[in-house]
Amino acid sequence: MPLLWLRGFLLASCWIIVRSSPTPGSEGHSAAPDCPSCALAALPKDVPNSQPEMVEAVKKHILNMLHLKKRPDVTQPVPKAALLNAIRKLHVGKVGENGYVEIEDDIGRRAEMNELMEQTSEIITFAESGTARKTLHFEISKEGSDLSVVERAEVWLFLKVPKANRTRTKVTIRLFQQQKHPQGSLDTGEEAEEVGLKGERSELLLSEKVVDARKSTWHVFPVSSSIQRLLDQGKSSLDVRIACEQCQESGASLVLLGKKKKKEEEGEGKKKGGGEGGAGADEEKEQSHRPFLMLQARQSEDHPHRRRRRGLECDGKVNICCKKQFFVSFKDIGWNDWIIAPSGYHANYCEGECPSHIAGTSGSSLSFHSTVINHYRMRGHSPFANLKSCCVPTKLRPMSMLYYDDGQNIIKKDIQNMIVEECGCS
C-alpha cells in the first residue's frame, strides 16, 4: 500500500487516540509526545466515557469515507419487500431467510485475487533439440525451483504452411512425453495416456489437437498436469516428441529448431548450394518461431519461504505491537435504518510497544523503511536519534457498503483500505 496513505491513516488514528485518551495531567496515562500512536497502549479501558467517544470517532470516519457531511435523513424508508426484491434483481447482495441482507464482497475477492497474482511467477523456456529426431527438450529455469503449484503450462509450436500447397485443411498434432521409468510404475494422470514402452523408456500422450493447415500460425498445447507431476517428483526437465502424420501430405511442417539442430543444419544448407545470405535470413526467421514452454506457477501455501510473518492479535497476554479487535454494530448505534449492509464495522486498531529488536519485522511496505531508520536510530545518528518506532497498520482490506442516500436511492460503494488486518512497527 502506498506509504503516503499509511501516514494519512496514522493521523486519523492519532485523532482517535487524542479524543479517547485522558488529559495530559491524568496520573499514570500520559501520552508519549514523540509517538502519539503508541498512546493507544495506554488507552483507559475502564473509563466510562472512552467507548462512546471511540464510537463517535468511528462514525465520523465512516461518513468521511462515504463523502457525507452527516448521516442521510431516512424519513420514509423503502418498504422492506421492495428493497429485498431490488437487491435480488440487481445481484448486489444475498437475502437470508431471516430477511437480513448480506452484501456480496466482490472487492474483497478481487483483493485476494490480486494478492495471489502478485505471488505468481511466469517463466518462458525455449526448446532445445532433443537426442532423437522430432524431439524437444525443455529445461525449466532455476527461477522456478521454489514454485510447486502450477497455475498454467503450455507448449507453443509454430506450424509453417507453404502457400503453393494447401491440399489438406486439417492436421492432427500430438505431443508425447519421453521419460525413463521402471515398468509398472507409471502415473498417467488425467492428461497423459501411456502409449508405448521400450524397456525402461515410456511415452505418454501429453496433448493432442486438430489444427487448421491452411495458414502458418502458432498453436498452443496445454501440459499443466504433466508439469505439475514433474515438479511433484522434484524434476525440472521435460522431453517431448512431436508427431504430425498428416503434415507431410499437406505440405505443412512444424518448426522444431533448437540450438543443436541449428548447428547440424548449417552444413546441410551449404551443401544444397543456398547462398549464405538467404540461408542466414531463413535461419533467423526460423529462430523467431522457436518452440517454447510458458509456465505460470506459485509457491504452495505451506512453503517455508512463502510464510509471511503475521501480525499479532491482542489477547491481553502480550504488550508488544498487535491488532486490537473493535466491532461497532450499526444497530447498536442507530444506523441500521440507512445502512442496509453490512451489519457493522470492524474498526480494528493497533496498540502495543515497539522494542528496537522487532522494528521493521513486519512483511509490509513499511518494513524496509523501518529497518533503515532503526539501523541509524540505534547508532544515535541524527535526525533519527530521538525517533521512536510506532505500532501502525501494515495491512488493510477493503469494505463494501450498501446504504440509502438522502434521496432514498440505494448506493453500493466499495471503500479501499477500510479495515485493519495486521499491525507492525514503523
Swiss-Prot record:
Report the transmembrane regions from the record: none
Q: Which InterPro entries match?
A: Cystine-knot_cytokine (IPR029034), Inhibin_betaA (IPR000491), TGF-b_C (IPR001839), TGF-b_propeptide (IPR001111), TGF-beta-rel (IPR015615), TGFb_CS (IPR017948)
Pfam families this protein is in?
A: TGF_beta (PF00019), TGFb_propeptide (PF00688)
GO CC terms of this entry: activin A complex; enzyme activator complex; extracellular region; extracellular space; inhibin A complex; perinuclear region of cytoplasm
Name the Gene Ontology molecular function terms of this record: cytokine activity; growth factor activity; hormone activity; identical protein binding; peptide hormone binding; protein-containing complex binding; type II activin receptor binding
Q: Where is the composition biased (Basic and acidic residues)?
A: 263-274
Listed SUPFAM superfamilies: Cystine-knot cytokines
From which residue to which does the signal peptide run? 1-20
What is the protein's major site of localization? secreted
Quick check: keyword Disulfide bond in the entry?
A: yes
Q: Which UniProt keywords apply?
A: Cleavage on pair of basic residues, Disulfide bond, Glycoprotein, Growth factor, Hormone, Secreted, Signal
- Which residues belong to the propeptide? 21-310
- Region feature Disordered, mapped onto this chain: 259-288
Can you cite a GO biological process for this protein? roof of mouth development
The record's annotation in SMART domains points to:
TGFB (SM00204)
Disulfide-linked positions:
314-322, 321-391, 350-423, 354-425
- Keyword presence, Repeat: no
Intracellular or extracellular location(s):
Secreted
Sites where a glycan is attached: 165
What exactly does this protein do? Inhibins/activins are involved in regulating a number of diverse functions such as hypothalamic and pituitary hormone secretion, gonadal hormone secretion, germ cell development and maturation, erythroid differentiation, insulin secretion, nerve cell survival, embryonic axial development or bone growth, depending on their subunit composition.
Protein family membership: Belongs to the TGF-beta family.
Assembly and interaction partners: Dimeric, linked by one or more disulfide bonds. Inhibin A is a dimer of alpha/INHA and beta-A/INHBA. Activin A is a homodimer of beta-A/INHBA. Activin AB is a dimer of beta-A/INHBA and beta-B/INHBB. Interacts with FST and FSTL3; these interactions prevent activin A interaction to its type II receptor. Activin A interacts with ACVR2A. Activin A interacts with BMPR2. Inhibin A interacts with ACVR1; this interaction creates a non-signaling complex (NSC) that inhibits ACVR1-mediated BMP signaling. Inhibin A interacts with ACVR2A.
Q: What is this protein called?
A: Inhibin beta A chain
